[in-house]
Amino acid sequence: MSQTTTNSASETLGFQAEVKQLLHLMIHSLYSNKEIFLRELVSNASDACDKLRFEAIDQPGLLDGDGELAIRVDYDKAARTITISDNGIGLSRDEAVANLGTIARSGTREFFSQLTGDKQKDAQLIGQFGVGFYSSFIVADKVTVLSRRAGLAANEAIRWESDGQGEFSIAPAEKAGRGTDVVLHLRADEDELLNGWKLREILRRYSDHISLPIRMAKEDWDAEKGEQVKGDELETVNQANALWTRNKSDITDEQYREFYKTVSHDYDDPLAWTHNRVEGRSEYTQLLYVPRHAPFDLWDRDARRGVKLYVKRVFIMDDAEQLLPSYLRFVRGVIDSADLPLNVSREILQESRDVRAIREGSAKRVLSLLEDMAENKAEDYATFWTEFGQVLKEGTGEDAANRERIARLLCFASTHDGEQAQTVSFADYVGRMKDGQDKIYYVTADTFTAAANSPHLEIFRKKGIEVLLLSDRVDEWMLSYLREFDGKSLVSVAKGGLDLAELADEEEKKRQSEVAETFKPLVERLQQALAEQVKEVRVTQRLVDSPACVVVGQNELSPHLLRMLKAAGQEAPEVKPVLEINPDHALIARIRDASDAEFGDWAALLLDQALLAEGAQIADPAAFVKRLNGLLLKA
């Protein structure tokens, strides 16, 4: 942040570069849904009151005799302003600079790099990022914030002001009571918002569920003036009770959607939600949502989580990661406990038996929601899987109690249709298994293309046996925990000695035995030439079109996992592969007849070729090219 002007009374500061970019994009991308500014500002006001209520548990003096928390919305036609006021926690000078001048979130730069210039696509991305206070500038060409932090004196208030063009000023101010007033100086074409009926309509649509009263001046018809006139009496324009405390039958889908947008600051509707009251040993209410799009910081393990914790309707914290396991970190919503103490700390949350019960119950509830979506709303589940599938896979290792349920929700690409889209479940695979087949086969690779073109698949394609194509970074980790499904082992086609005996007839088995004996001299010759690079050379039945491939032992780390470990700077053991040769390939016949002078080059070329086909890097590319050119010239 750059400082441009300073004096004892006022400072003019430059917005963080990302804020400038966000303001510009928002004004141009979100204008078609400009009314969200009021939802965002009312939501911020509600959060400020929630935070005061929480801090006042330990510091009752912060309430200063004014314990009735509320939000007020007013407008002034003559001044062309809309004011949103609250008597919540307020802002100190440093908090105003930090919260109204910067975006203190990791991954911000990466987020902006995804923007395309397409208004519709950018609007969705900005919605995932969260617009908050800055949405004011969609309808205002100047915003003034007058705020006094609870516990500070009247003369320690601040006045923040900006036209959204790149700078803001901040100065000391006087304010009689704690809290914040946000004054929007409307743009010239926004007169329709200077209307009590219009503002009430927006508030009831977007903010009816806010648990605090939202008040406006009562208006009566003035026959002389021919218009509505504001009086001194205030009226509450929303229902002012927490949405999650109402009966499900009393809540419309539209109200559920708008509540989601408030708690998540998302621009889009959610994919699904679950609202449930749990009674028994632990009593709590949960209203949990699955978003339609992944947030930009989904893979940031330190990012704030999306579930707000309340205790007896009193807000406690808004990133309580203990309430759901990490693999469900995309879930948004609220959990309201009747059992936890109001002064609960993060340390208590980690040790509380009630919190463990909430965590387990909430995880099961979300999994039930996903199961219902997978079974009854295939299109929605496909959207969910595209956005969050890799995160859900983490659950196979993190949540042993629900591992089987999670396994049933997993989707993969497969040789069945050859498409990159991950649409095949384990149940789909099992339903198509060949008679006599008792294993689920898979291959892992760095990319889908590498997996789909792996030489290890050749015999499976020939026999019509389906293989799952795994190329997500999390897949290898998942497989270390997920060893079977419905009693059927998960088997890598690139590990160990391939055993398809149950699918081979007697004649085929006899031929395999004869071939192994016939090629024994070549195998021994290759083993001697490649003794430093490979553990073993053997004849294989797994190849059809390729001359050779490399495999590792059944209990060894796969080459794909070893590459990932090295790329992450982790120590990775040196694993010598097994070289398998295809006795029916013309190149193997050529090598079989090679002279002793050429044999070493042929053997090295065969191994390097197999390593490249598997996706590995060869140790000496220059030597590979030299050998290849030399053998081509002799051909």
UniProtKB/Swiss-Prot annotation:
Description of how the protein assembles with itself and partners: Homodimer.
Job of this protein: Molecular chaperone. Has ATPase activity.
Location of the protein in the cell: Cytoplasm
Xref: Pfam families: HATPase_c_3, HSP90
Family: Belongs to the heat shock protein 90 family.
Organism for this UniProt entry: Bordetella parapertussis (strain 12822 / ATCC BAA-587 / NCTC 13253)
Any one of the GO CC terms: cytoplasm
Protein name, entry field: Chaperone protein HtpG
Keywords for the protein's UniProt record, in alphabetical order: ATP-binding, Chaperone, Cytoplasm, Nucleotide-binding, Stress response
Signal peptide: none
GO terms, molecular function: ATP binding; ATP hydrolysis activity; ATP-dependent protein folding chaperone; unfolded protein binding
Span list, region C: 564-635
Domain of life of the source: Bacteria
Location of region: A: 1-346
